[in-house]
């Protein structure tokens, strides 16, 4: 999906999908099921995860404990927890025992949140500007992780991003203007419009066969 500019409703739409915001009209279908009336918890149980633009902090909870909590019934070994942190560009040994509190930068908290989403093995992962506040090396590592998920084809990703490298991963881009679909097509068709600065920042969908 792609919107014309900042303030166009990218984050609002993502939150509606997750159930954080209620739609004023219309319905939300996920894998052919109407989930409009489902709670956040019910949507999460169906395999939908959401990464905030500004993730919350959890004083008193360590990164290790948060990853274990995210994994649910799956018993994560310490090595598995470390691997998820590595995928988002963090040195695991430096973070596992740290609390998710104000001592961490915004970029660090964002990457930790992304790691928890990876640990959940969600069917639908929604990321709101995952590159915000992240250094170039970590961004490259994170992009490699997104590319790997995309290639495996086991999950759908909706990524709100202004970064060309992430946008190019999209299978399909839908441009919405004034509440209507203005353009819809594959990346090769729509991406030149972005390069020409005809359109603004965009959420990107990378999807498997399951429809949203």
Model-derived segments and spans:
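Conserved ABC transporter NBD signature motif
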Residues: 26-33, 46, 80
């Amino acid at each position: 999906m792609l919107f014309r500019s900042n303030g166009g409703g990218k984050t609002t739409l993502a939150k509606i999908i997750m159930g954080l915001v209620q739609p004023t009209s219309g319905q939300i279908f996920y894998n052919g099921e109407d989930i409009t009336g489902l709670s956040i918890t019910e949507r999460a149980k169906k395999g939908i995860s959401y990464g905030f633009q500004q993730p919350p902090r959890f004083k008193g909870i360590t990164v290790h404990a948060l990853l274990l909590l995210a994994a649910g019934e799956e018993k994560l070994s310490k090595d598995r927890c470390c691997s998820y942190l590595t995928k988002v560009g963090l040195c695991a040994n430096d973070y596992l025992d740290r609390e998710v509190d104000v001592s961490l930068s915004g970029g660090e908290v964002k990457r930790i949140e992304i790691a928890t989403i990876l640990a959940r093995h969600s069917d639908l992962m929604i990321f709101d500007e995952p590159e915000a506040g992240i250094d170039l090396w970590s961004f490259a590592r994170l992009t490699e992780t997104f590319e790997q998920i995309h290639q495996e084809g086991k999950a759908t990703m909706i990524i709100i991003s202004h970064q060309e490298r992430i946008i190019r991963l999209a299978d399909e881009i839908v441009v919405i203007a004034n509440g209507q679909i203005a353009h819809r097509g594959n990346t090769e068709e729509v991406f030149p419009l972005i390069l020409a600065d005809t359109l603004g920042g965009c959420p990107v969908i990378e999807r498997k066969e399951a429809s949203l």
